[in-house]
Amino acid sequence: MELKKLMEHISIIPDYRQAWKVEHKLSDILLLTICAVISGAEGWEDIEDFGETHPDFLKQYGDFENGIPVHDTIARVVSCICPAKFHESFINWMLDYHSSDDKDVIAIDGKIHRHSYDKSRRKGAIHVISAFSTMHSLVIGQIKTDKKSNEITAIPELLNMLDIKGKIIKTDAMGCQKDIAEKIQKQGGDYLFAVKGNQGRLNKAFEEKFPLKELNNPKHDSYAISEKSHGREETRLHIVCDVPDELIDFTFE
């Protein structure tokens, strides 16, 4: 990835510090922080250490006229930036590498950030919904939610950030919702949803249409793959067919 483009995008982030007190440029601090975290840094001191060991690399893209900032300065400055602007600039950087012309498959999924729960402050764990480009192996969109149940309302917001024309959107069963399907189609995309118990009638209809004997001897075009995952052998069977007549008028719950 070109870090020069990153520098262009983070330049939109406003610096609220008093100009006469500024010793390190905001863009330099953010460049250092992003590169360090991508490289595995887990704390402010790690970020400072990364800067001290990679000064020549960082100076290819930033000024760093006064050297590498100390960890206290990095923490203070980063805590004061506008989260929304930082999010916008970072996602735009990712989108630079995501062509609107390719036939990509975008996987949308929610994850809970490890160690983000703070019991002493009664602060729940951070839940994030991400859009992952499988073609480019990039996160091209991300939204924070309060809890997993909010995924249904967060997914449409995430879709607003993306150009999904001609692309396939994949979600788990939580995203199997009529409104989400309609939104994807309106934006020119297609979708592949998982159907489970949260769509009771629809799930039952699929089970009746594709009983176990059909899965063991598919009548339609099919493809099976086997892989090891989570310590077990998994076989995935893909059956491709036109929508059966009995499901054409079947709606989401």
From Swiss-Prot:
GO biological process terms held by the UniProt record: DNA transposition
InterPro entries associated with the record: ISAs1_transpos, Transposase_11, Transposase_11-like, YbfD_N
Protein name, entry field: H repeat-associated putative transposase YbfD
GO MF assignments: DNA binding; transposase activity
NCBIfam families named in the record: transpos_ISAs1 (NF033564)
Pfam family, one: DDE_Tnp_1_assoc
Protein family (similarity comment): Belongs to the transposase 11 family.
